[in-house]
Amino acid sequence: MIKAVLFDVDDTLYPSSKLAEEARRNAIRAMIEAGLETDLSEEELYRELQEVVKEYGSNHPRHFDLLLRRIGADPEPKLVAAAVVAYHDTKFAYLKPYPDVIPTLMQLREMGFKLGAVTSGLAVKQWEKLIRLGIHHFFHEVVISEEIGVEKPNPKIFIEAARRLGVKPEEAVYVGDRLDKDIRGANRAGMVTVRIRRGKYQDMEPRNDDDVPDFEIDRPRELLDVVRELAKD
């Protein structure tokens, strides 16, 4: 019997990849407007920034300093500050959940399910997202990789989330967008898995049996039919 529903955060509850791209592009424009001298175009600078993010990880605190050094420019505080302000202004202005997320979370709570979030990243950053999205209060538990010491797809983070919610892994449904992180890890933990086809990874194909979800949906409200069907078992 299903007793809990757990969610990934980025690109599952809000358009993370799209928002990050727009914020980074605006940061590039802000540096140019602040006086960055370079022969590279905006698009070339964006590609260089993407390489920095890929190499150092999305949580590195000094992406823009690294970008400037990468292109042979002096990382002047003015340029870095302009990029940081533009980046955060963009993210904060447009950080909103997908339209059907809040009604779905409300209905799941009304149906009596315990709700949880399982996400990789820095704890403060992930909590900030949930609070700014206005959805943190829906979750009984939020489990973040930095606090646990392992990241998806390690099944330990999913098992810990189930433990905190007071349910067995097989009594939990997990919803996420990435087959190689969300679905693989939750499957290995023994949960019922639901892939939501949204964002950057919507066309990803399974690499092995662990990447195959039990269900696929296109939007959160379709999850309600899934849990109703599972409740019959």
UniProtKB/Swiss-Prot annotation:
Any one GO biological process: small molecule biosynthetic process
Coiled coil start-end: none
Membrane-traversing stretches: none
EC id: 3.1.3.-
UniProt entry keywords in alphabetical sequence: Hydrolase, Magnesium, Metal-binding
Cofactor: Mg(2+)
GO function terms (MF aspect): metal ion binding; phosphatase activity
Protein role: Catalyzes the dephosphorylation of D,L-glyceraldehyde 3-phosphate in vitro.
Family as reported in the entry's similarity comment: Belongs to the HAD-like hydrolase superfamily.
Name this polypeptide is given: Glyceraldehyde 3-phosphate phosphatase
Organism of this sequence: Methanopyrus kandleri (strain AV19 / DSM 6324 / JCM 9639 / NBRC 100938)
